[in-house]
Amino acid sequence: MNVTTRENGGLRQRDLDALARAEHADPFAVLGPHGDGAGGQVVRAFLPNALKVRIQARDDGRVLAEMEQGSLPGLFSAHLDKAQPYQLHIVWAGGEQVTEDPYSFGPQLGDMDLHLFAEGNHRDLSGRFGAQPTQVDGIDGVCFSVWAPNARRVSVVGDFNNWDGRRHPMRLRHGAGVWELFIPRLGVGETYKFEVLGKDGILPLKADPLARATELPPSTASKVAGELSHAWQDHDWMAQRAQRHAYNAPLSIYELHPGSWRCELDEAGEIGRFYNWRELAERLVPYVQELGFTHIELLPIMEHPFGGSWGYQPLSMFAPTSRYGSAEDFAAFIDACHQGGIGVLLDWVPAHFPTDEHGLARFDGTALYEYDNPLEGYHQDWNTLIYNLGRNEVRGFMMASALHWLKHFHIDGLRVDAVASMLYRDYSRKAGEWVPNRHGGRENLEAIDFIRHLNGVAAHEAPGALIIAEESTAWPGVSQPTQQGGLGFAYKWNMGWMHDTLHYIQNDPVHRTYHHNEMSFGLIYAYSEHFILPISHDEVVHGKHSLIDKMPGDRWQKFANLRAYLTFMWAHPGKKLLFMGCEFGQWREWNHDAELDWYLLQYPEHQGVQRLVGDLNRLYREEPALHEQDCQPQGFQWLIGDDAQNSVYAWLRWSSSGEPVLVVANFTPVPREGYRIGVPFGERWQELLNSDAELYAGSNVGNLGAVASDEVASHGQPLSLALNLPPLGVLIMKPA
């Protein structure tokens, strides 16, 4: 043994050089305790900038040895006559520290965990990987782990080691490409990142992909989180959820962005402080109950660096954003919703992720989470990267994210964003700018397999949860069972209905006669999928105008058109979704940096729209004909679909027991007196709702609450009603 080796605890020069450069691939081979072959052990610790280190007994603090610093600054070593549990007493320039040696502990991740991870079949990644507070050999600490198979070295860095990547290099578990390290005496709330020496020699600081808590943006570090300790009180809701989510049950969704629904304003009237989840629950739950929605849908709440993405460019798929509080606060919010009889759906983004340096992009110096080829892995529309769902570990990562929210947080469903971009390799790409699949086609076979697998696993692991597709193409069978060749979603957003009906309602009434089929065309395919009718955030931003501002005419006509449109929507087959602000007719487009214009509710027209939405929801829930057969063609019957000259539509909705509701819509500002409409039976039909009623700030044209039927056959029916149709109004009636 030469002098250099002897001075440095028996290490060879190449090990010393690797430690000095922070490039040692196997720190456990050189650091920590190593047997000397005679019952004793050599202990080495690499502690750059330490002034002095001694080894002391773990049980009673006896000094066992003073460690010597060799030729490599920061490398301390000592010999112990016998192997025993020990601690390091470290003297720094700013104070002293006593800790167990991270390199004295064995591997912490089990072989089965690593095997399931590599297969992509680990269902609880957030409960085993990332940063897990735990106890090893009676010592409290945190076990860190991260997948980076192509990295040359990975270290845990944070305030606890002055962000020095030389201090805590990790152990590589070769079979799975996972690096791990147990660091004693760390706890919940500690900030950290991974310093990854990539295959390309670049040394970025990466946030933990499996972090369950993060710093508040614009800071980007991960935070150690404990197990969710919330004591759930939503047992009744969870027991009844599958029944509430049946296709024959009402489903009416209030879509909202939690930061701009309500907030605390500063003196300039801008957002001064976001409400915490618990504060939000106190305000939101009574409001949603009063309006009669069955569910809320939150724009993505997974941590995202850029608030202007509205959450649709998330980087922490397991961490609720810290903007509104902790994971415990979020759990309390969901619990409060459930106890108030309100379901909670989350928008979830498995299609793509942003390119931020601290995120998933080229995580270990290679394209790890994304496709390597930009023609497959880069989304030019959003400047984002596309998940490589053909890779086991990535597929397992996304599956575990979905289950994390569904199981740990009792989420009632996920609305999967941008499904069309996942299904097609040529989505929004020109010829020559995409890579065909192995059969030469445009379908993304890996994403399709993932989606089907996701829906199957979710149905088993989270019974009763809804997985909903935002899918804008004519892909067949999106909401059909996978056993029948479908994708297996519970529902699909009906984007075609939304585009057609909004185009129609924006036309001046004098021109609507030429667009008559735009309001009725949706019924041709209404039962090809299980549909949700969405008036979402996307329709009230980017110069598209707010919902009421899309309406033509003067102020009175705009409100009448809006009320008629919403009533038409609620009476149309399909479940309902309405974005916040639309329920009271906000004039401004949605702005994520400002709360809704609640002051408008001092005006009767806005109060009227809000009251109408509440009454529509109550009617929708109370009348079986309006919800039981939303997804069954026998639940709908046209009476008048061809009166383009008068812009009138009329139809019957039927309950499963044969009870009808009549819907009549007049989309011109001209009242129609004595307009005859056939009905199947009933001596007297009562008005359940009139969108032109005075209590909605309408002109109050109607039928004085009820109409007697005449024995005059009409529209193929034996009886008929002579109705007064309100201008720009919709009537909903049923036999008295």
From Swiss-Prot:
<dbReference type="Pfam" id="PF02806">
    <property type="entry name" value="Alpha-amylase_C"/>
</dbReference>
<dbReference type="InterPro" id="IPR054169">
    <property type="entry name" value="GlgB_N"/>
</dbReference>
<keyword id="KW-0320">Glycogen biosynthesis</keyword>
<dbReference type="GO" id="GO:0003844">
    <property type="term" value="F:1,4-alpha-glucan branching enzyme activity"/>
</dbReference>
<dbReference type="InterPro" id="IPR013783">
    <property type="entry name" value="Ig-like_fold"/>
</dbReference>
<dbReference type="InterPro" id="IPR013780">
    <property type="entry name" value="Glyco_hydro_b"/>
</dbReference>
<dbReference type="InterPro" id="IPR006048">
    <property type="entry name" value="A-amylase/branching_C"/>
</dbReference>
<dbReference type="InterPro" id="IPR006047">
    <property type="entry name" value="Glyco_hydro_13_cat_dom"/>
</dbReference>
<keyword id="KW-0328">Glycosyltransferase</keyword>
<comment type="function">
    <text>Catalyzes the formation of the alpha-1,6-glucosidic linkages in glycogen by scission of a 1,4-alpha-linked oligosaccharide from growing alpha-1,4-glucan chains and the subsequent attachment of the oligosaccharide to the alpha-1,6 position.</text>
</comment>
<keyword id="KW-0119">Carbohydrate metabolism</keyword>
<dbReference type="InterPro" id="IPR006407">
    <property type="entry name" value="GlgB"/>
</dbReference>
<dbReference type="InterPro" id="IPR004193">
    <property type="entry name" value="Glyco_hydro_13_N"/>
</dbReference>
<comment type="subunit">
    <text>Monomer.</text>
</comment>
<dbReference type="InterPro" id="IPR044143">
    <property type="entry name" value="GlgB_N_E_set_prok"/>
</dbReference>
<dbReference type="GO" id="GO:0004553">
    <property type="term" value="F:hydrolase activity, hydrolyzing O-glycosyl compounds"/>
</dbReference>
<comment type="similarity">
    <text>Belongs to the glycosyl hydrolase 13 family. GlgB subfamily.</text>
</comment>
<dbReference type="InterPro" id="IPR037439">
    <property type="entry name" value="Branching_enzy"/>
</dbReference>
<protein>
    <recommendedName>
        <fullName>1,4-alpha-glucan branching enzyme GlgB</fullName>
        <ecNumber>2.4.1.18</ecNumber>
    </recommendedName>
</protein>
<dbReference type="InterPro" id="IPR017853">
    <property type="entry name" value="Glycoside_hydrolase_SF"/>
</dbReference>
<dbReference type="GO" id="GO:0043169">
    <property type="term" value="F:cation binding"/>
</dbReference>
<comment type="pathway">
    <text>Glycan biosynthesis; glycogen biosynthesis.</text>
</comment>
<keyword id="KW-0321">Glycogen metabolism</keyword>
<dbReference type="Pfam" id="PF02922">
    <property type="entry name" value="CBM_48"/>
</dbReference>
<dbReference type="Pfam" id="PF00128">
    <property type="entry name" value="Alpha-amylase"/>
</dbReference>
<dbReference type="GO" id="GO:0005978">
    <property type="term" value="P:glycogen biosynthetic process"/>
</dbReference>
<dbReference type="GO" id="GO:0005829">
    <property type="term" value="C:cytosol"/>
</dbReference>
<feature type="active site" description="Nucleophile">
    <location>
        <position position="417"/>
    </location>
</feature>
<dbReference type="Pfam" id="PF22019">
    <property type="entry name" value="GlgB_N"/>
</dbReference>
<feature type="active site" description="Proton donor">
    <location>
        <position position="470"/>
    </location>
</feature>
<keyword id="KW-0808">Transferase</keyword>
<dbReference type="InterPro" id="IPR014756">
    <property type="entry name" value="Ig_E-set"/>
</dbReference>
